[in-house]
Structure formats: structure tokens, C-alpha cells
Amino acid sequence: MFDWVGLLLKVLYYYGQIIGLINFEIDWQRGRVVAAQRGILFAIAINVLICMVLLLQISKKFNLDVYFGRANQLHQYVIIVMVSLRMASGISAILNRWRQRAQLMRLVECVLRLFLKKPHVKQMSRWAILVKFSVGVVSNFLQMAISMESLDRLGFNEFVGMASDFWMSAIINMAISQHYLVILFVRAYYHLLKTEVRQAIHESQMLSEIYPRRAAFMTKCCYLADRIDNIAKLQNQLQSIVTQLNQVFGIQGIMVYGGYYIFSVATTYITYSLAINGIEELHLSVRAAALVFSWFLFYYTSAILNLFVMLKLFDDHKEMERILEERTLFTSALDVRLEQSFESIQLQLIRNPLKIEVLDIFTITRSSSAAMIGSIITNSIFLIQYDMEYF
């Protein structure tokens, strides 16, 4: 059967190399990460080219009317902040990949080893991977279409600026997609662990009803204890992957979340400006407006996918804790070693709760996400009020 999921993952890998985000090579057959000289030199060449393009853009005057045919001063400030933050996010992602290259290589190798251990995990996540891939592709094509729409207003400086802006967007989107795929992989493994825990508890429940106890009973208890210990070991590995992911993507995470925040406020303000002034007042064509709002839709769809997969992982972790609590319903005591194995994995989950943190500044939860949305709404209102008063 054709492995289209594996093909998509390899396309993402090579795309990451082409845009300069991945600076190592992967041996897919052996599940190894290789620091090949060819990959290093290619990444250096791409990164140097990016820096040259950015320096060329900074040294030249850029006409902000390529975004709106007629923009007031507040529009220009908003655009400058958005573009500057995107450039800073892209550069920080590239620099961080070199600074934490060894740690990232260990993380990828750890993920690949578990991935090859149970290849059907890939099939469990196939539709989520396809949706994320499709949203990313459509988003990139829409951004290219928006750039093509403004070709008649582009000089050389503006063309370089739009090209570098697109390149930085591609790097940021790819970094976010990599984070998404790792979390998705961990969540798929959690589904397997929950199934195994349920089976072990069910078999233990059946054993607890057996009396008198014989040698076969003790053998079965030892077998179940080994299974629980293996589950605990694998859960610890998965949590270690999430911890390493927090460390590797820390700086990128704060830049991306800052970008989502600023971009959401700016999007609300621009939508207000278009609703009040009309697209003709801003010298924006109907097709350009349709492309922009279509891109907004896919941009936020991607953000929602990223958020939901993290929140669902928290739910899976909590559900695993709840499943383990069912062992207290056994009708009689089990073997001491099996009881200790159950207690050990429960203590492991309680003592080391799952967290997805952004640079140790805040933890991603439903409450923190709701607070961020509330803050976005508040600051969007402030920006609109400022526009109403002074422009």
C-alpha cells in the first residue's frame, strides 16, 4: 500500500532544508540524525542568502503602499510592527536552530526511534497530518497570490521586501508545523498507552477475583507488572520529549505567540478600517481583499490546529490519570509487585505533570488561551478607539 503519509513527512523535511530551517540530515531507514557536511554547508549557504536579502531590504527605503494603495499613518505603524515582528521571528528561529542544534538533533533522533518502534502511530495521525499540510500549502499559495496582486505597485525594493517577508513566513510556518507534528506524535502514543493501561487494569480486575491463588496467578501478576513498568517507562520518554520540545522551541514560541497576539490585534483593526472606509478608500481591489481575508482564515485555522492538539494532549494525560484510579476498585489485593507498579506510575504522573511552556514564562492551558483572547479583544478596542479619535 502506498505510504502517502511518509511521503508528506519527507516533503516537509526537504522543504525545511530548502528554506534554511533544517541544518542536519535524517536517515529515515535507521532512524538516525546525521550531521553531514553537505547538509551543514547547504544550510549555511541558505542562511547567508537570507541575511543578505534582509540587509538589502533594511538598507533601502520601502514603500508601504504596496500593502494598501492609500494608508494613513496608523496603518503604516501597524504594518511596520507586523513586518518587523515577522522578520525578528524568522531570524530568531534560524539562529536558535544553530544555537540548539545538538539538542534538536537528539530530540529528533528520540522521536524517530519511537516512531520506528511502532510505525502504525503514523497511520493513527494521518488525517491530522494531511489537514495541517493542506492548510499550510493553501496559506503559502494565498500569500503568493497576494504578492502577485500587488505587482503593479512593486519596485525593486518592494519586491525584495515582499520576497523576504514571504521567506520569513515560510520559516515561521515550518517551525510551527514541526512543533505540531511532534505534539501530534506524542498524542498518538498516549492513545496507545491509554489502551494498554485499560487492558492491564481489566486483566488485573479479573485476577483479583481469582481465589485461591496459585503459581499461574503469580506468573500473570509478574507479567502484568512488567507491562505496567514498560508503560511507565514509555510515558516518561514521551514526557521527556515534550520537555525537550519546550526547551528547543522556547524562544521561537514566545516570538510566535507574540506574533499571533500582535497580528490578531492588527487584523481586527484592519477589518474595522475596511468596514468603515471601504476597500475603495484604501485603494484595495475586491480580489485583493478576498485573498487577504482568505489568507486570514487559513492563518487562524493553522493557529487553532496548533492550540487544539496541545490542549487535547493535556486531556489525554488527565484521562490516563483517571483510568489508573480505577485500580482502587479491585475486589481484593493483588501481588505486591503489581500493586507497586500501579502505585509507581500513578506517582510518576502526579509528581511530574505534563506541561507545555513558552520559555518558562507561561503555560499553555485553556485558561491562559482564554486570557490571551480577552487581552486581544481589549487591545483591539483600544486601537480602534485611537483611530476614531486621531485619524
UniProtKB/Swiss-Prot annotation:
Signal sequence span per UniProt?
A: none
Q: Which InterPro entries match?
A: 7TM_chemorcpt
Which residue ranges run through the membrane?
4-24, 39-59, 74-94, 127-147, 166-186, 248-268, 291-311
Q: How does the entry describe its membrane topology? A: Multi-pass membrane protein
One cellular component term (GO) for this entry is: neuronal cell body
Pfam families membership: 7tm_7
**Annotated localization:** Cell membrane
The entry lists its GO molecular-function terms as: ligand-gated monoatomic ion channel activity; taste receptor activity
Keyword hit for Signal: no
Keywords linked to the UniProt accession: Cell membrane, Membrane, Receptor, Transducer, Transmembrane, Transmembrane helix
Q: Name one GO biological process term.
A: sensory perception of taste
The highest taxon in the source lineage is: Eukaryota
Tell me which family the UniProt entry assigns to this protein.
Belongs to the insect chemoreceptor superfamily. Gustatory receptor (GR) family. Gr22e subfamily.
Q: What does this protein do?
A: Probable gustatory receptor which mediates acceptance or avoidance behavior, depending on its substrates.
This protein's name: Putative gustatory receptor 36a
**What gene is it encoded by?**
Gr36a
